[in-house]
Amino acid sequence: MIKVAINGYGRIGRSILRALYESGKRDQIQIVAINELANPEAMLHLTQYDTTHGRFQSPASLDANVMTIGDDRIQLLHEADAEKLPWRSLDIDIVFEATGALIDRQACEAHIRAGAKQVLISHPSSGDVDATIVYGVNHQDLKAEHKVVSNASCTTNCLVPIIQVLDRAFKVRSGAITTIHSAMNDQQVIDAYHDDLRRTRAAGQSIIPVDTKLARGIERILPEMKDKFEAISVRVPTINVTAIDLSVTLDKRVDIDTVNQVLSQAANGSYQGVVGYTNAPLVSCDFNHDPRSSIVDGTQTRVSDGHLVKLLLWCDNEWGFANRMLDTSLEMIKAVRA
């Protein structure tokens, strides 16, 4: 059994907890504590009721600073300084760092000094972390000595398995990416101040370009893709699910059927549970609450001149990523205990 704590109980923190109880991994992972500055009543309420993912199916209640889920008692903490958290006395194996604020090694080492054995960051990180992991692609690279690990981003988890499949089958020369991402809580409900002038605008009224370092994130996982990709990102007025428009130039000559067959075989083979494939005429909301990292929409595959391939990928940017946090944490402990 792994003892974990969640630091930051926002969209990803709550999705991790819910995913644990829905995924069948509760017999392997125990959430001992949650640290969040919000009041306990709000934490319970947002656990029970979620606009995006619906009602929590497990019984949950609150007694002072303890949230009970079924037979589990989870301590609720409200500490702003990570170094003061009681991870040593709680014997925490892994902290899920989900605040979005502690995203580099130096910041996350506060959890280690507080007594946690390892930290898994729910955010892309700088190169000084011990490893950046995309489960299904490079989780086998985890080592016992890795203390601070990044789970990359939802879009990196969506793209990298597909790029790896295409490169192994056809050799990728270059690529361009457009991420069509649902609105996030760093945007405004109505026009308000923000350092990014585009993010001063109402999230529900515009398609909003935002900066992205996605191409560099791909290189971190697949070094052979260095300088081969560029990416742009736009936020759209939906509350969940992301589409990715991926264009790649391949060495080998292909057609639509060949590309789709390779991707379908990957989804049903070694990437099963991480990659999906569909030919159904679906829209974004049909992928809400989908635990996979990436779903290929085979109906939208296009090939130009035998070498330029365009794909449409879907992912639930909350739920899929939360499930990968759980998967990666299990691999971290497996490496420690090997």
UniProtKB/Swiss-Prot annotation:
<dbReference type="InterPro" id="IPR006422">
    <property type="entry name" value="E4P_DH_bac"/>
</dbReference>
<protein>
    <recommendedName>
        <fullName>D-erythrose-4-phosphate dehydrogenase</fullName>
        <ecNumber>1.2.1.72</ecNumber>
    </recommendedName>
</protein>
<keyword id="KW-0520">NAD</keyword>
<dbReference type="InterPro" id="IPR036291">
    <property type="entry name" value="NAD(P)-bd_dom_sf"/>
</dbReference>
<dbReference type="GO" id="GO:0005737">
    <property type="term" value="C:cytoplasm"/>
</dbReference>
<dbReference type="GO" id="GO:0051287">
    <property type="term" value="F:NAD binding"/>
</dbReference>
<comment type="pathway">
    <text>Cofactor biosynthesis; pyridoxine 5'-phosphate biosynthesis; pyridoxine 5'-phosphate from D-erythrose 4-phosphate: step 1/5.</text>
</comment>
<dbReference type="GO" id="GO:0048001">
    <property type="term" value="F:erythrose-4-phosphate dehydrogenase activity"/>
</dbReference>
<keyword id="KW-0664">Pyridoxine biosynthesis</keyword>
<comment type="function">
    <text>Catalyzes the NAD-dependent conversion of D-erythrose 4-phosphate to 4-phosphoerythronate.</text>
</comment>
<dbReference type="InterPro" id="IPR020830">
    <property type="entry name" value="GlycerAld_3-P_DH_AS"/>
</dbReference>
<comment type="subunit">
    <text>Homotetramer.</text>
</comment>
<feature type="binding site">
    <location>
        <position position="317"/>
    </location>
    <ligand>
        <name>NAD(+)</name>
    </ligand>
</feature>
<dbReference type="InterPro" id="IPR020831">
    <property type="entry name" value="GlycerAld/Erythrose_P_DH"/>
</dbReference>
<dbReference type="InterPro" id="IPR020828">
    <property type="entry name" value="GlycerAld_3-P_DH_NAD(P)-bd"/>
</dbReference>
<feature type="binding site">
    <location>
        <begin position="153"/>
        <end position="155"/>
    </location>
    <ligand>
        <name>substrate</name>
    </ligand>
</feature>
<dbReference type="Pfam" id="PF02800">
    <property type="entry name" value="Gp_dh_C"/>
</dbReference>
<dbReference type="GO" id="GO:0006006">
    <property type="term" value="P:glucose metabolic process"/>
</dbReference>
<keyword id="KW-0963">Cytoplasm</keyword>
<dbReference type="InterPro" id="IPR020829">
    <property type="entry name" value="GlycerAld_3-P_DH_cat"/>
</dbReference>
<feature type="active site" description="Nucleophile">
    <location>
        <position position="154"/>
    </location>
</feature>
<feature type="binding site">
    <location>
        <begin position="11"/>
        <end position="12"/>
    </location>
    <ligand>
        <name>NAD(+)</name>
    </ligand>
</feature>
<comment type="similarity">
    <text>Belongs to the glyceraldehyde-3-phosphate dehydrogenase family. Epd subfamily.</text>
</comment>
<feature type="site" description="Activates thiol group during catalysis">
    <location>
        <position position="181"/>
    </location>
</feature>
<dbReference type="GO" id="GO:0050661">
    <property type="term" value="F:NADP binding"/>
</dbReference>
<dbReference type="Pfam" id="PF00044">
    <property type="entry name" value="Gp_dh_N"/>
</dbReference>
<feature type="binding site">
    <location>
        <position position="199"/>
    </location>
    <ligand>
        <name>substrate</name>
    </ligand>
</feature>
<dbReference type="InterPro" id="IPR006424">
    <property type="entry name" value="Glyceraldehyde-3-P_DH_1"/>
</dbReference>
<feature type="binding site">
    <location>
        <begin position="212"/>
        <end position="213"/>
    </location>
    <ligand>
        <name>substrate</name>
    </ligand>
</feature>
<dbReference type="GO" id="GO:0008615">
    <property type="term" value="P:pyridoxine biosynthetic process"/>
</dbReference>
<feature type="binding site">
    <location>
        <position position="235"/>
    </location>
    <ligand>
        <name>substrate</name>
    </ligand>
</feature>
<keyword id="KW-0560">Oxidoreductase</keyword>
<dbReference type="GO" id="GO:0042823">
    <property type="term" value="P:pyridoxal phosphate biosynthetic process"/>
</dbReference>
